[in-house]
């Protein structure tokens, strides 16, 4: 059983487990299946909008498919949520990603 299959089995047991859904998105991206990674992290964003790690990765995956408009929107939303939850490290990373987009 692959890591992705294991994670999917865990998610089937607990569909509200944000970390497992996040890890599935990362596994798809690791396989360069950015469409599935985006779909999975968008589902996570719908289910648990305050799961801050989602935003940096999701924005990056949008960049991988050359969708800078969505990447920027995701980074900005994540930055607001990170600041709201006082996650200064995530806020810093999201701001850096936004700045990098602006430099392009």
Label each region the model flagged.
Residues 9-12, 43-46, 80:
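Conserved structural position within tetratricopeptide repeats
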């Amino acid at each position: 059983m692959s890591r992705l299959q294991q994670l999917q089995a865990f998610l089937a047991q607990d569909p509200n487990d944000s970390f497992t859904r996040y890890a599935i998105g990362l596994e798809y991206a690791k396989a360069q299946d950015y469409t599935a990674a985006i779909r999975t992290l968008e589902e996570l964003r719908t289910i648990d909008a305050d799961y801050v790690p989602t935003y940096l990765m999701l924005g990056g995956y949008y960049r991988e498919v050359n969708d800078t408009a969505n990447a920027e929107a995701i980074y900005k939303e994540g930055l607001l949520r990170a600041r709201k939850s006082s996650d200064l490290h995530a806020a810093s990373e999201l701001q850096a990603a936004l700045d990098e987009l602006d430099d392009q």
